């Protein structure tokens, strides 16, 4: 972590995961194009459990959600920037596009919309008695993906796929979203209208 003038870098013991620049005279407009949220991926459920437990202890408003293929919680920073904290859980299921919508299939074959409340007690069962909630993020923590608000999902897909070269992992006009990939990861870039 470092701070110099109006800039700061945040990380997990290695390279910076996030660079911040303070611009005190700028006004924030919600719902415009730009950042929707960025996501921090934890190496395992135990580390995510520590992060979520810390939010609970600090009474920081967050929204634990079970996307089946990931366990996650959402929160906003003081300026309203969306943040997702998550860990992968592919053993629980996967997502597909069906009838122009994103759906998830659990490992047992049952279907879900992937937006269920997270069972936080089950998540907290991964904590150990000596886990400290005030420890820094583990070094394996990284930025998992970024979601952008876009004016038109198809135009954005045409650009990021056709010009930049991302793979299209899924596109839903019903949900007004797209998941784009590089190297097979489910979506280092998400697009939402």
Predicted feature descriptions by range:
Residues 35-40, 90-154:
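N-terminal beta-strand motif that seeds the catalytic metal site of vicinal oxygen chelate
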Residues 2-33, 82-89, 167-193:
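Conserved short beta-strand elements that form part of the metal-binding/catalytic scaffold
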Residues 61-64, 130-136, 166-167:
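Short helix-to-loop capping/linker segments positioned immediately adjacent to catalytic or ligand/cofactor-binding
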Residues 14, 39-82, 90, 150-157, ...:
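Vicinal oxygen chelate
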Residues 16-61, 65, 111-129:
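Short secondary-structure boundary segments
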Residues 43-46, 62-66, 87-90, 99-100, ...:
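Glycine-rich loops and low-complexity Gly/Arg-rich segments
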Residues 5, 35-37, 70-72, 82, ...:
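Extracellular structured ligand-interaction cores
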Residues 135-179:
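Conserved small-residue-rich
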């Amino acid at each position: 972590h470092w701070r110099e003038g109006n800039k700061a870098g945040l990380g997990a013991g290695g390279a910076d995961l996030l660079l911040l620049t303070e611009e005190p005279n700028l006004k924030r407009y919600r719902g415009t194009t730009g950042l929707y949220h960025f996501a921090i991926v934890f190496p395992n459920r135990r580390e995510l459990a520590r992060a979520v437990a810390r939010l609970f202890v600090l009474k920081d408003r967050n929204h634990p959600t079970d996307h089946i293929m990931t366990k996650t919680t959402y929160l906003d920073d003081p300026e309203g920037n969306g943040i997702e904290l998550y860990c992968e859980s592919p053993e629980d299921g996967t997502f597909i596009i069906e009838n122009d919508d994103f759906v998830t299939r659990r490992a047992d074959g049952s279907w879900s919309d992937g937006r269920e409340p997270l069972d936080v007690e089950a998540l907290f069962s991964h904590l150990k008695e000596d886990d400290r909630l005030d420890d820094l993020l583990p070094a394996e923590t990284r930025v998992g993906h970024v979601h952008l608000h876009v004016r038109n999902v198809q135009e954005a897909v045409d650009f990021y796929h056709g010009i930049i070269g991302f793979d299209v992992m899924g596109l839903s006009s019903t949900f007004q979203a797209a998941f784009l990939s590089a190297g097979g990861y489910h979506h280092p870039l998400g697009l939402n209208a």
